[in-house]
């Protein structure tokens, strides 16, 4: 079978061409353009208000200095982190708990619960936020909006995180459950014969073996949290608790489209991309170390 | 089945000081109750919106939250929704379908082809290319939305269907999934046999490779469909004409317009309901075809 094992073919290159072209056009080029813009600024032109023929000139690190020196930028990052601190662990803990319960012996109503918990994934984020907005609003709230101020200065972080958790819980649960079903059953039976209780099997046998999947789910949740935009933007019209610069992406949007300073917006969005990549790499490394340690 | 085969084992465990009482047919209450609480949490807002959509505006603020109304509020709300601004809601729904079906179809083709090429062929630069694409998983697509807008605006290409569809076609995760799946499921022997039979590379890709990859392609299609249907930021920055809006944008616009006046809440509520129902139906119908194990399987590789 050594006869011309690989014929000369350009098929793989042809198959890759659309993906590579689109990747260059819509990922690499915009990224590069944003970096370019972040080092530029608008120079006032002639005329009464300096608006005639404005020119773009090199600004050096001015936009970055402005972003770094701006307290509101750091506040927006702080708010995003607060939502993440509430939302990410809640997502992981709840979805893992539900997955373990689905896998538990003699649990009932498993099919129904699985579908019900998965349902919010089919609800678009904006629509989910509108839904929860009505749940939070005192005028319409079925969950005690008259007694609980869901938009209070501390509560608002939980309210926003809740919407995000509600939306992704089911998807994560199914991912974890699927990988749980793929584990060798004999191990659990062996542990059972050794006298381990259902709870002990879940915590000491199943959970450690889920480590790679939990790593993936955590990294995805983290990336999701750093991109927080839909929920606060959609809640903004119904409450004063959320400003137009509440989280970094809203801030970038406001810079670029409301204040018409695309250069500052570009600098801030490039900073965010750097932060996201750094956070993802860090989370991946830490979780891998933890997983390795728990294997020993 | 598991309960039957391990029944004796669990009884043995109970006998040796295990904490679980009972035989194989007894309900395990703790996980069941936890699951039910989770189910109620996830379904509650949807149940509420179904009930709220039956109410007239005054009933919305006066009647008990979970008591449905039968005074014809539902149909008058629906009529008001579809009559709003000369029926623009229908237009938004059609737009959503165009974006999601068109985008997901094209994306499945683009990512499927790329995944197959990376999974089944080794050529100069292929390993390197794959690494770059996998690294792009770290790049949040959504954060690129604003630079994408700036670039497209520079080229005068915003405010049309392509501006929303094109940036979403390449999904690093989908390419990764297709590559891993092609490697494991499209066997070299079968391809070799086709070659010996004189099939061209193109032909063996179309009639063997593509067919064997169907489960991965269906999964990619559904992931992309939901992703595009739910995307908010990209249309939000790319479009400023409301006849191009997808449902999400449209409903958000409705909320802003009606934000100050509670009198319009019923339109938004029934709009939310109408936008959930079709997707939830498609979703429940197709849920056994799409393979989440492919999604989680990626980490084991």
Model-derived regions: residue spans:
Chain A
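A structural signal for multi-pass alpha-helical bundles of membrane permease subunits
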Residues: 8-296
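Short, Lys/Arg-rich, polar N-terminal cytosolic tail immediately upstream
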Residues: 1-7
């Amino acid at each position: 079978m050594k006869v011309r094992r690989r014929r000369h073919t350009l098929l793989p290159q042809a198959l890759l061409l659309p993906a590579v072209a689109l990747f260059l056009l819509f990922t690499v080029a915009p990224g590069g353009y944003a970096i370019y813009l972040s080092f530029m600024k608008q120079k006032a032109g002639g005329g009464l208000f300096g608006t005639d023929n404005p020119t773009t000139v090199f600004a050096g690190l001015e936009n970055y200095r402005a972003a770094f020196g701006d307290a509101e930028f750091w506040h927006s990052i702080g708010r995003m982190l607060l939502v993440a601190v509430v939302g990410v662990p809640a997502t992981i803990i709840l979805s893992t708990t539900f997955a373990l319960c689905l896998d538990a012996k003699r649990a009932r109503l498993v099919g129904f619960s699985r579908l019900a918990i998965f349902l919010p994934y089919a609800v678009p984020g904006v629509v989910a936020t509108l839904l929860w907005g009505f749940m939070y609003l005192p005028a319409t709230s079925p969950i005690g909006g008259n007694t609980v101020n869901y938009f209070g200065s501390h509560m608002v972080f939980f309210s926003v995180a809740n919407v995000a958790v509600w939306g992704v819980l089911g998807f994560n649960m199914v991912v974890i459950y699927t990988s749980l079903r793929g584990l060798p059953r004999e191990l659990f039976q062996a542990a059972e014969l050794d006298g381990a209780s259902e709870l002990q099997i879940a915590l000491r046998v199943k959970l450690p073996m889920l480590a790679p999947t939990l790593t993936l789910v955590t990294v995805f949740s983290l990336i999701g949290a750093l991109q927080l935009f839909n929920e606060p933007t959609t809640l903004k019209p119904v409450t004063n608790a959320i400003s137009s610069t509440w989280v970094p992406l809203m801030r970038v949007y406001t810079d670029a489209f409301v204040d018409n300073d695309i250069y500052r917006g570009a600098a801030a969005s490039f900073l965010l991309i750097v932060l996201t990549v750094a956070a993802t790499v860090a989370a991946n490394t830490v979780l891998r170390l933890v997983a390795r340690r728990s294997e020993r | 089945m598991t309960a039957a085969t391990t029944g004796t084992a669990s009884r043995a465990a109970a006998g040796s000081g295990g904490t679980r009482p009972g035989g194989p047919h007894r309900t395990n209450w703790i996980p069941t109750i936890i699951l039910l609480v989770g189910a109620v949490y996830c379904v509650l807002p949807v149940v509420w919106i179904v009930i709220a959509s039956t109410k007239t505006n005054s009933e919305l603020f006066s009647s008990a939250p979970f008591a449905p109304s039968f005074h014809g509020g539902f149909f008058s709300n629906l009529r008001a929704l579809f009559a709003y601004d000369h029926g623009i809601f229908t237009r938004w729904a059609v737009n959503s379908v165009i974006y999601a079906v068109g985008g997901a179809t094209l994306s499945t083709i683009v990512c499927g082809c790329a995944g197959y090429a990376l999974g089944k062929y080794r050529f100069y630069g292929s390993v390197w290319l794959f690494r770059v694409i996998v690294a792009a998983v770290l790049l949040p697509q959504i954060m690129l939305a604003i630079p994408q807008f700036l670039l497209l605006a520079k080229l005068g290409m915003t405010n049309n269907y392509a501006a929303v569809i094109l940036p979403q076609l390449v999904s690093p995760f989908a390419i990764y999934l297709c590559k891993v799946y092609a490697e494991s499921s499209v066997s070299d022997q079968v391809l070799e046999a086709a070659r010996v039979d004189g099939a061209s590379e193109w032909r063996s890709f179309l009639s063997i490779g593509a067919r064997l990859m169907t489960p991965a392609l269906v999964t990619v299609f559904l992931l992309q469909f939901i992703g595009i249907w739910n995307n908010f930021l990209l249309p939000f920055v790319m479009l400023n004409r409301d006849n191009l809006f997808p449902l999400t944008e449209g409903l958000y616009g409705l909320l802003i317009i009606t934000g100050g006046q509670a009198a319009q809440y019923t339109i938004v509520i029934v709009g939310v309901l109408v936008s959930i129902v079709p997707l939830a139906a498609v979703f429940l119908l197709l849920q056994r075809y799409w393979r989440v194990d492919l999604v989680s399987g990626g980490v084991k590789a």
